[in-house]
Amino acid sequence: CFHLFNDYSGSPKVLKIVLEGLLKKGYQINLITSTGGALDELLYYKNLSKHSYPYRFSNNPIVTMLRYYMVQLYTFILTFRWLFYKDVTFYINTLLPVGPALAGRIMGKRVVYHYHENAFVKGTFYKVLATIMQKLAHKIICVSEYQASFLQQKKCVITVPNALPQNFVNRLTPNFQAAFKRKHILMLGSLKLYKSPLEFI
């Protein structure tokens, strides 16, 4: 499983839920991601091995892109340690880990993308990555039908909406009548301006 930047944003948190479900079912998982972040909370599972690299954003976009390309080269090369393993699936979380996706395809492995972004509202770089994803992926998991509607590839695309962590759901005690009277709404969203509405009416 490949994820570029292990922080506490939405995509690594969703990946954590997915991986935890697989780990509890006994799957052996190799996680390749940066140091720190939400995914490190899975390290106590004995059937998970983590391979880390240093990665962070810079205020200088050129430095950020150089770091990104270095990580793609590193993970592309690292990926070949699974060349002779059978029944290996390369799970690519977000558009960004294109290096291991390409290596997986070269080796004849099954490549599954979990596509969190909407590349077609983010600019040329993400549009190029989305085009590459559609060429390399055996399966693309989208988080909404709206997001999937922008993809040219339709055959291998499925929609799986993001879930909330089970420990959060367990704390809920729904009372629909009381909720209707209170008229309070919980809106879960990103703090990033381009992802969130400015007003909720």
Region locations from a protein language model:
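Carbohydrate-associated surface elements
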Residues: 146, 163
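Conserved donor-binding/catalytic core segment of Leloir-type glycosyltransferases
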Residues: 176-196, 201
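A short, glycine/small-residue-rich beta-strand->loop->alpha-helix junction that serves as a flexible
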Residues: 2-17, 193-195
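An aromatic- and histidine-rich active-site surface loop
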Residues: 38, 72-76, 88-107, 122
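A conserved, positively charged/aromatic
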Residues: 67, 83, 112-141, 149-152
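A short, histidine- and acid-enriched strand-loop-helix "catalytic/donor-clamping" loop
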Residues: 5-8, 59, 98, 107-125
